[in-house]
A protein has these predicted regions:
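Acidic/hydrophobic-patterned starts of short beta strands in beta-sheet-rich repeat architectures
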Residues: 12-24, 81-93
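Short amphipathic beta-strand and strand-loop transition segments with alternating hydrophobic
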Residues: 6-10, 23-25, 74-80
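Repeat-based blade/solenoid architectures
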Residues: 1-5, 60-76
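Acidic, small-residue rich beta-repeat scaffolds with periodic aromatic anchors
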Residues: 1-13, 104-106, 111-218
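Short amphipathic beta-strand/extended segments with alternating polar/hydrophobic composition
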Residues: 47-64, 119-130
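Short consensus segments that form the blades of beta-propeller domains
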Residues: 22-34, 64-69, 96-102
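A short, structured loop/turn motif at beta-sheet edges
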Residues: 77-87, 111-117
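Surface-exposed turn/loop modules enriched in turn-prone residues
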Residues: 29-58
Length: 218
């Protein structure tokens, strides 16, 4: 399915595991619309044939602008947070259908075995800041340090951006998936989310900031 963009093999208490990631952006249809998708699957390789543990598929259908669906390679992690030999597999990806430069939908998803899945869903930092020639500085709200509703609303008030929809760029909507999850899962996912957003924010800001002009040489 699509173009393979990642493959990972490891062993844990369940046996030998294979994780495959793929994505694709289609050519435009006759009417100019475009589609895109991401695909991921984890298989157990022990035995005569692979045993599918889970599959992920998400897409953008019939986008009249520019469609996109891409894995964030820094998001892929295999962990053993409980120390019981059972792996948690985390992947993250963005989706968009837009005609301008603006944040993408972003999902960070953790799978454990065949049936457990925990998600953080929000928007990333792509396009969240821009260079203001007159001010000679980057403009836009900074990356929130806390994605609670109160913290996001405080940032909106501070920057006098009342009416801004939540979540803010770089934040997720809620942590409801983790209500009954082991505490280390949410702690890891929170930290991982902000690490990814901080890196993206830094990379984006560097792209927007003009390079210093070289002194004229005589």
């Amino acid at each position: 399915r699509g173009k393979q963009v990642g493959a990972f093999v490891w062993s844990d208490k369940q046996g030998k595991n294979l994780l495959v990631l793929a994505e694709q952006v289609s050519e435009r249809d006759d009417d100019g619309a475009q589609s895109a998708f991401v695909y991921a699957a984890q298989d157990l390789l022990d035995g005569d044939r692979p045993k599918r543990l889970w599959m992920l598929y998400d897409d953008v259908q019939h986008c009249e602008f520019d469609a996109g669906a891409h894995f964030n390679s820094d998001a892929t992690r295999v962990t053993d947070l409980l120390g019981d030999g059972i792996s948690q597999v985390t992947v993250g990806y963005s989706r968009t259908c837009t005609s301008d430069v603006s944040p993408n939908d972003f999902k960070l998803i953790m799978h454990i075995g065949k049936s457990q899945k925990y998600r953080l869903r929000g928007i990333d930092r792509y396009g969240a800041s821009w260079w203001d020639e007159d001010a000679g500085a980057l403009q836009g709200m900074p990356l929130p340090k806390d994605c609670s509703i109160a913290a996001q609303q405080a940032l909106v008030s501070q920057y006098k951006e009342q009416g801004t929809e939540l979540p803010l760029p770089g934040c997720y909507g809620d942590e409801e998936d983790f209500a009954k999850a082991p505490k280390p899962y949410l702690e890891f996912m929170r930290q991982h989310w902000f690490t990814l957003m901080q890196k993206q924010d830094t990379d984006w800001s560097q792209q927007q900031t003009p390079a210093p002009a070289e002194d004229d040489q005589e």
